[in-house]
Curated annotation (Swiss-Prot):
GO cellular component: cytosol
Similarity comment: Belongs to the RecA family.
Highest taxon in the source lineage: Bacteria
Listed GO biological process terms: DNA recombination; DNA repair; SOS response
Role noted for this protein: Can catalyze the hydrolysis of ATP in the presence of single-stranded DNA, the ATP-dependent uptake of single-stranded DNA by duplex DNA, and the ATP-dependent hybridization of homologous single-stranded DNAs. It interacts with LexA causing its activation and leading to its autocatalytic cleavage.
Protein name: Protein RecA
PANTHER family attached to this UniProt entry: MITOCHONDRIAL DNA REPAIR PROTEIN RECA HOMOLOG-RELATED (PTHR45900:SF1), RECA (PTHR45900)
SMART domains found in the cross-reference section: AAA
Length: 378
């Protein structure tokens, strides 16, 4: 009996060695034909943690779970008209440029306001802009920019405005069933691999439409077919809620609106989280406003009555004064922002220390430059 078991083990071992050798030969042939890295074991990947770029909003970074938009993935931002979709995308553009990257904006709607983009922190002199004549042209331009590997972020505004060339050449009233959906499906198949390979973030802004004859369930849908829904790693539903009234002389006028951004799909973190932000007209997302709210909830900023304080020092009476104080003291803003990110697990302790060191060096350099400037003036 023992001899029989031993013989079976030897046969199994021999068979296993032959299979392993056959696999190694197959892997060598694949690498020879398609290049190194065409097939690999999952544990051998150098970067197992998903790389992200901040969205430009602390609340949205927290809702996304990973700390921002995942690199090498497709993002869809959709919602009703004037809900803040383009504003959210422009904050991503400003953040990409802030981190030293190159951003491109495919303006299919031909409606981008350069002054508003600049107000949100976008360097319009460095932003690559295209206003294509057709949907195919816009997607082809986006594809060439992504294939170059030099662009960090591409924004397409919007999918609904990517009109197929056949529809443009035809007459109004002609039926073009499924043309846009086929165009988007082909584009997704073509672009997805290149986006992942070059680690480019591709943001597609989309509109809403109503399904005809829906009696039960949500009648809302997005144009462009289903391909984008499948290929997108993150889908954001942006909706404005209540108007923000001004104070003093502006108490009767609206100066912004509270907006909810729901993560309806997320392949890199748990979905269905909601970010509540304030979008101020002409300014974009109030970064100081969201920081005061989140830091107060975490007791990083202490609130006693109407007063807000940090580390025992009062920073303002009322949220507006606290926001103004943080806007005037960017080094304090960065310090509190880092503490919030560490609290939510978006940064490790070591990353916090290095970020604080960089911020300290920048502050010292700024002070030195100011001193030198004073000496030159004298």
């Amino acid at each position: 009996m023992a001899k029989k078991l031993k013989k079976n083990e030897e046969i199994t071992k021999k068979f296993g060695d032959e299979r392993r050798k056959a696999l190694d030969d197959a892997l060598k042939n694949i690498e020879k034909d398609f290049g190194k890295g065409a097939v690999m074991r999952l544990g051998e990947r150098a970067e197992q943690k998903v790389q992200v770029m901040s969205s430009g909003s602390l609340a949205l970074d927290i809702a996304l779970g990973a700390g921002g938009y995942p690199k090498g993935r497709i993002i869809e931002i959709y919602g009703p008209e004037s809900s803040g979709k383009t504003t959210v995308a422009l904050h991503a553009v400003a953040q990409a440029q802030k981190e030293g990257g190159i951003a491109a904006f495919i303006d299919a709607e031909h409606a981008l306001d350069p002054a508003y983009a600049a107000a949100l922190g976008v360097n319009i002199d460095e932003l690559l802009l295209s206003q294509p004549d057709s949907g195919e042209q816009g997607l082809e331009i986006a594809g060439k920019l992504i294939d170059s590997g030099a662009v960090d972020l591409v924004v397409v505004d919007s999918v609904a405005a990517l009109v197929p060339r056949a529809e443009i050449d035809g007459d109004i009233g002609d039926s073009h069933v499924g043309l846009q959906a086929r165009m988007m499906s082909q584009a997704m198949r073509k672009l997805s691999a290149s986006i992942n390979k070059t680690k480019t973030i591709a943001i597609f802004i989309n509109q809403l439409r109503e399904k005809v004859g829906v009696m039960f369930g949500n009648p809302e849908t997005t144009p462009g077919g289903r391909a984008l829904k499948f290929y997108a790693s993150v889908r954001l539903d942006v909706r404005g809620t209540t108007q923000i009234k001004g104070t003093g002389d502006q108490k009767d006028s609206s100066i912004g609106k509270e907006t909810k951004i729901k993560v309806v799909k997320n392949k890199v973190a748990p979905p269905f989280k909601v970010a509540e932000v304030e979008i101020m007209y002409g300014e974009g997302i109030s970064r100081t406003g969201e920081l005061v709210k989140i830091a107060s909830d975490l007791d990083i900023i202490q609130k006693a009555g109407a007063w807000f304080s940090y580390n025992g020092e009062k920073i303002g009476q009322g949220s507006e004064n606290a926001k103004r104080y943080l806007a005037d003291h960017p080094e304090l803003f960065d310090e509190i922002d880092l503490k919030v990110r560490v609290k939510f697990g978006l940064l490790e302790e070591s990353e916090e220390e290095s970020a604080m060191a960089v911020a300290s060096e920048e502050t010292d350099d700024l002070a030195l430059d100011l001193d030198n400037g004073i000496e030159i003036e004298d």
